[in-house]
UniProtKB/Swiss-Prot annotation:
Topological category with respect to the lipid bilayer: Multi-pass membrane protein
InterPro entries: ATPase_P-typ_cyto_dom_N, ATPase_P-typ_P_site, ATPase_P-typ_TM_dom_sf, ATPase_P-typ_transduc_dom_A_sf, HAD-like_sf, HAD_sf, P-type_ATPase_bsu_IA, P_typ_ATPase
Main location: membrane
Annotated TM spans: 34-54, 65-85, 216-236, 245-265, 569-591, 611-631, 644-664
Name of the protein: Potassium-transporting ATPase ATP-binding subunit
Enzyme class: translocase
Record key words, sorted: ATP-binding, Cell membrane, Ion transport, Magnesium, Membrane, Metal-binding, Nucleotide-binding, Phosphoprotein, Potassium, Potassium transport, Translocase, Transmembrane, Transmembrane helix, Transport
Top-rank lineage group of the source organism: Bacteria
Upper taxonomic lineage: Bacteria, Bacillati, Bacillota, Bacilli, Bacillales
């Protein structure tokens, strides 16, 4: 579990209790019309306690009125506590994050190379700073010199230090993290108030935690039901007078509270907040509650092969020359094309070449390095005497053809052989002559087959996008268990895939980390960006994974579904409760005047007074009983949507009808001795 778990402590509970009383303010409760009605009823009951005959002759003792008042107060406090406790978890994490950036100083590098100590808040973008072992990095930036290990646990919760160095994919650093070895020179990329940590704090504190469309729709439904029940209660009073049935105002207030959907009304905000918090516990930042909720509607998941389905550290395992006489030349050419390649693949090619080549390989190569891009899909070096490139088969074949070169007859079979094993083939050319193929071995992550099977049962289709050729993609897709794949996929192709799926009415989720992924992340309904990715990718996405683990998208989608299921399950339970309470209480109230109603008093409640008190107590206790479910969410198993629906109707629908009858009867058996 991550570091947020430590916030389940006594201090949090005490703070939530304090906030429960603060939220009694009518200005606070007006945001929740259901609980607002309960508080208005509580205030009217308090008026009746002070002035018993203000609404006519009172037929209830002051002690009975005080009992109703206390139960109504406790009901509101329980509802407020559930929301305050959920909010408190986020605030506690925000306080911890804020501590990571407090009272920081920086060692600013002057133009003459001298150092000057300044406050971290004075740093400007573009300035250079030096951070040494044991010091906290004062601002977001990029490493321009040095190599060191950095402890990012204050931000990500991951205890293992990570290596940061200039160049490559690991040169970005976050303000508030700790250098645990050596030193770094960093170019500042953000100023005070705009850092990644500042944005995290704003997100965690819920600055943008507005109600989601589904939540608003449900609130509208519940408010409408509340108004309907209010109308029923108001019309009940003249009907009771006509039937010569005495129904004191306090009992009508209590009856109203029992019948309106107070259970889900008291828990709805907590469910939404807790859903965002569960995502945070997985070290994923949600920019809004809407993002988490949309995750629950996702039915198509676009996944990159490298890093998501496979481990991503493809390793060169073999050199396959077009003929054995070319082996030595192939090794040297592969080495030269990779010597300035900082990717894991490039480094593995250099290692393999050194292991296999018995003669001395060239060390200092004076030339122009051409890095890999998504468009060219090749990398290499051009010198005065020679040009050497390695890259994807199609790209290399097209390049050789454009320059009127020859294509060896067996080059295609060599590539197919590698692809059929699930590997990635890279063709190596020297001066437009094909020398052979590099076999990059890729390994599928453990447990993915089972997880994809579970997603399929939940109605989610998985689509693998990869730059590999169709044969390699098909082999990996079959082994991993994904539903479909898109081979030789470029960044713009991802956008087309997403738009095509959305045009069919699907809700699409995807992951990305590069600037070239930003348009697709913005187009997708759910975009999960990696913390190690570019700023543009993180701005385009609506979720950010602090662990930079693309596989996390699967967990986030499950949390979104859990949020929707929890809200639906507790709404079903609450409405079923109201129906049960209606048939439990009304006969007990009417049977003294209408003897025919006695047959409907199936629970044999002892008296109208005890029936009302018992129902009110049950109404308050059920909110407390359901807080753990609202916070943790209902269990999500790999069942089909139909199976989940049936299970929820049996557990929360039927259970919502049965539990009130049993609960109210048990409470009535105790209350009858005091009323």
């Amino acid at each position: 579990m991550h570091h947020v778990n430590k916030y389940f402590n006594q201090t949090m509970v005490i703070e939530a209790l304090k906030m429960s009383f603060y939220k009694l303010n009518l200005k606070q409760l007006i945001k929740n019309p259901i609980m607002f009605v309960v508080e208005v009823g509580m205030i009217l009951t308090l008026i009746l306690i002070c002035f018993p005959d203000i609404f006519g002759t009172s037929y209830l003792s002051r002690g009975y009125l005080i009992t109703i008042f206390i139960i109504l107060l406790i009901t509101i406090l329980f509802a407020n506590f559930s929301e305050a406790f959920a909010e408190g978890r986020g605030k506690a994490q925000a306080d911890s994050l804020r501590q990571a950036q407090s009272n920081l100083t920086a060692r600013l590098i002057e133009e003459n190379g001298a150092y000057r100590i300044v406050n971290a808040t004075e740093l400007k973008a573009g300035q250079n700073i030096r951070v040494e072992n044991g010091e906290t990095i004062p601002a977001d930036g990029v490493v321009i010199n040095g190599l060191a290990t950095v402890d990012e646990s204050a931000i990500t919760g991951e205890s293992a230090p990570v290596i940061k160095e200039s160049g490559g994919d690991f040169d970005g650093v976050i303000g508030g993290t700790l250098v645990t070895s050596d030193w770094l020179e960093i170019r500042v990329e953000s100023e005070a108030g705009t850092s990644f940590l500042d944005k995290m704090i704003a997100l965690v504190e819920g600055a943008e935690r507005n109600k989601t469309p589904n939540e608003i729709a449900l609130f509208t439904l519940l408010t409408t039901l509340t108004i309907i029940f209010l109308v029923v209660i108001v019309t009940l009073y003249p009907i009771a007078s006509y039937l010569h049935l005495i129904l004191p105002i306090a009992m009508l207030i209590a009856l109203t509270v029992c019948l309106i959907p107070t259970t889900i009304g008291g828990l709805l905000s907590a469910i939404g907040i807790a859903g965002m918090d569960r995502v945070t516990q997985f070290n994923v930042l949600a920019k809004s509650g809407r993002a988490v909720e949309v995750c629950g509607d996702v039915d198509v998941m676009i996944l990159d092969k490298t890093g998501t389905i496979t481990y991503g550290n493809r390793i060169a395992s073999e050199f396959l020359p077009v003929n054995q006489q070319m082996l030595e030349k192939l090794i040297v050419a592969a080495y030269m094309s990779s010597i300035y390649d900082d990717t894991p693949e490039g480094k593995s090619i250099v290692r393999l070449a050194k292991q296999m080549y018995i003669n001395e390989l060239p060390k200092d190569i004076d030339g122009t390095y051409k890095p890999f891009t998504a468009e060219t899909r090749m990398s290499g070096i051009i010198t005065n005497e020679i040009s050497v490139f390695k890259g994807a088969p199609n790209s290399m074949i097209n390049l050789v053809k454009q320059q009127q070169g020859n294509i060896p007859l067996n080059i295609e079979s060599l590539c197919m052989d590698v692809s059929s094993k699930g590997g990635t083939p890279l063709i190596v050319i020297e001066n437009n002559v094909m020398l052979g193929v590099i076999y990059l071995k890729d390994v599928i992550k453990d447990g993915l087959v089972e997880r994809f099977t579970e997603l399929r049962k939940m109605g989610i289709e998985t689509v693998m996008c990869t730059g590999d050729n169709a044969l390699t993609a098909a082999t990996i897709a079959k082994e991993a268990g994904v539903d479909r794949f898109v081979a030789e996929c470029k960044p713009e192709d991802k956008i087309k895939v997403i738009k095509d799926e959305q045009a069919k009415g699907h809700i699409v989720a995807m992951t990305g980390d590069g600037t070239n992924d930003a348009p697709a992340l913005a187009q997708a309904n759910i975009g999960l960006a990696m913390n190690s990715g570019t700023i543009s990718a993180k701005e385009a996405a609506n979720l950010i994974d602090l662990d930079s683990n693309p596989t996390k998208l699967i967990e986030v989608v499950k949390i979104g579904k859990q949020l929707l299921m929890t809200r639906g399950a507790l709404t079903t339970f609450s409405l079923a409760n109201d129906v049960a309470k209606y048939f439990a209480i009304l006969p007990a109230l009417m049977m003294s005047t209408i003897p025919e109603m006695t047959s409907l008093n199936i629970m044999h409640l002892s008296s109208p007074k005890s029936a009302i008190i018992s129902a009110l107590i049950f109404n308050a206790l059920i909110i407390v009983a359901l807080i753990p479910i609202a916070m943790k969410g209902v269990k999500v198993k790999g069942y089909s949507i139909d199976r989940i629906f049936i299970n929820n109707m049996l557990i929360y629908g039927l259970g919502g009808l049965i539990v009130p009858f049993l609960g109210i009867k048990l409470i009535d058996m105790i209350v009858q001795f005091f009323v």
